A protein has these predicted regions:
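N-terminal metal-binding scaffold of metallo-dependent hydrolase/deaminase domains
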Residues: 1-46
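Divalent metal-coordination and catalytic microenvironments
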Residues: 12, 33, 56, 67, ...
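Active-site metal-binding motif and surrounding structural segment of the metallo-beta-lactamase
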Residues: 42-59
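Metal-associated gating/positioning segment near the N- to mid-region
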Residues: 54-119
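Active-site-adjacent beta->alpha loops and helix N-cap segments on the catalytic face
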Residues: 106-113, 163-175
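Alpha-helix-loop-beta-strand connector modules within alpha/beta enzyme cores
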Residues: 109-126, 175-185
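Active-site gating/metal-coordination segments in enzymes
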Residues: 128-172
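Short, small-residue-biased leader/transition segments that mark boundaries at the very start
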Residues: 227-232
Length: 240
């Protein structure tokens, strides 16, 4: 959209924080890339350079996906930042958070800045790189949080690798509190799920297959939310 151009979106069903799940029929006037007016469908909009018929479509703010796997760098045979961004944009997502399970992992400033720059180059949606909780997502040593935060990272996760060491996770929570960053822990005690192929229960017992107990998740959630800290329990605000 060029600077100063106007667009009218007519006949769509508005779905946002002001509506219920059914939305409401309304028309939208956009000027210079900014929503200037939303009016009921039967009312007139100002004239515009372009008119879009959105009959039968949903018109909403852009969606944000907090967990995507763009695979770049290192696993481009599965996905790239450009192809993942294109898929996101086609689905109505204007921002995505890229998980750090790349090769190398997003545990250094240079990798984080590469991911962000590739997102800008693609120019299809905002690509927000996350950082690792631990170096290489290996659960052995904490990633350099201050360095990554200075590079613009605010969300840290080891993606599908839960941090198994309680002391290491406690240290991570303390840093998260002090640096005002957010941790996303994969809630799984891996020693309880080794070899599991389905939920634990009567079905897996009948089939003779190893089950995945709910306790594996419950224990990790309880552990994270029970950690004492030296100052307060504010660390709980730092975990999602």
């Amino acid at each position: 959209m060029r600077e100063g151009q106007t667009i009218n979106i007519r006949g769509g069903r508005i779905l946002d924080e002001t509506t219920d799940a059914q939305g409401r029929l309304a028309d939208v006037h956009i000027s210079g890339g900014v929503i200037a007016e939303v009016v009921e469908a039967e009312l007139k909009l100002p004239k515009a350079d372009f008119d879009l018929d959105a009959t039968g479509c949903i018109v909403s703010p852009g969606f944000v996906d907090l967990h995507v796997h763009l695979r770049e760098p290192g696993r481009e045979e599965s996905e790239t930042i450009e192809t993942g961004s294109r898929a996101a944009a086609l689905g109505g997502f204007t921002a995505v958070v890229a998980m750090p399970n790349t090769e190398p992992s997003q545990d250094s400033r240079i990798v984080v800045e590469f991911v962000r720059s590739q997102g800008v180059r693609a120019g299809l949606c905002e690509v927000v790189p996350s950082g690792c909780i631990t170096v290489g997502r290996a659960g052995q040593a904490l990633a350099p949080y201050s360095e990554l935060r200075d590079a613009g990272v605010t969300l840290f996760t080891d993606d599908g690798n839960g941090v198994q060491d309680p002391l290491l996770m406690r240290r991570a929570l303390e840093y998260a509190r002090d640096l005002n960053i957010t941790l996303a822990q994969h809630c799984e005690v891996s020693s309880l799920t080794a070899g599991a192929v389905m939920h634990e229960g009567s079905c897996c017992s009948h089939l003779g297959l190893p089950g995945w107990p709910a306790l594996a998740e419950e224990l990790m959630v309880h552990r994270v939310h029970s950690f004492p800290t030296r100052r307060s329990s504010d660390h709980r605000k730092s975990v999602v």
